[in-house]
């Protein structure tokens, strides 16, 4: 087997994904979502549609126009994250809650982080392809350093969240 062999790109669902600890499937749309972790900035939540290009290794977090041009790979479409953190929180877990006990969470994604032990709730837009926020600080879809994140905090005080599971009883 040649070490110079190039894999056929049409066999890949998505490319450019970096250090993803969390992957989940939307039970309503069947769309894939993931979390990505970076070394210095730009931790992400992504909607991973077929032929998605997350941009790694050239882009962490949202891209400017010049960066987007630098990752043009035929057959794949770069997309900015649906949300990102300026400083790393290490989003490691992502899940939809389908329990009848929590109807208020049916249109949300829960994300846990390893660095601070926070559990976040992201409310989905009507099409379930992005998030809606009340706080204008999130209009840029970034939690910038020093900005309050109260709107998205669901629970705190955990130690290094690595997974989110809903038990058979819905809890």
For each predicted feature, which ranges?
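Beta-propeller domain segments
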Residues: 1-153, 159-161, 169
């Amino acid at each position: 087997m040649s070490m110079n062999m190039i894999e056929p790109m049409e066999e890949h669902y998505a490319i450019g994904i970096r250090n993803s600890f969390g992957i989940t499937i939307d039970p309503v749309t069947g769309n894939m979502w993931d979390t990505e972790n970076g070394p210095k900035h730009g931790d992400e939540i992504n909607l991973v549609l077929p032929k998605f290009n997350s941009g790694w290794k050239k882009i962490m977090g949202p891209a400017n126009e010049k960066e987007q041009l630098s990752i043009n790979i035929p057959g794949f479409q770069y997309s900015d994250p649906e949300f990102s953190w300026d400083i790393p929180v290490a989003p490691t877990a992502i899940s939809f809650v389908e329990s009848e006990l929590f109807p208020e969470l049916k249109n949300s994604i829960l994300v846990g982080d390893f660095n601070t032990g926070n559990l976040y709730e992201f409310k989905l837009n009507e099409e379930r392809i992005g998030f809606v926020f009340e706080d204008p600080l999130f209009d840029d879809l970034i939690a910038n350093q020093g900005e309050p994140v109260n709107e998205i905090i669901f629970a705190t005080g955990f130690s290094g969240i690595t997974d989110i599971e809903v038990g058979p009883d819905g809890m």
